[in-house]
């Protein structure tokens, strides 16, 4: 790709709240192979920010699926471990008036 500048980094962001399916596999393969083709990295980011739905068996299923697909992410990130960082950047965006907090109730949304 002649327009790419810097290192290519792709990510795989499954939510470990259900078993992975064929759509996950296709997405994982596209992201992984794209990063490989351009000498970049692929990051697995487990988007586990809904504790009511997340289960260990789903984390395990994602890992088993990646092994079966022969995908080895460069880095594994657990989103819930990064909440302090997310809040810090959200606060900064709000203070700079580049984001806002919505106070609508569920019904109005």
Each language-model region and where it sits:
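N-terminal Rossmann-like or analogous alpha/beta NTP/dinucleotide-binding catalytic cores
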Residues: 1-109
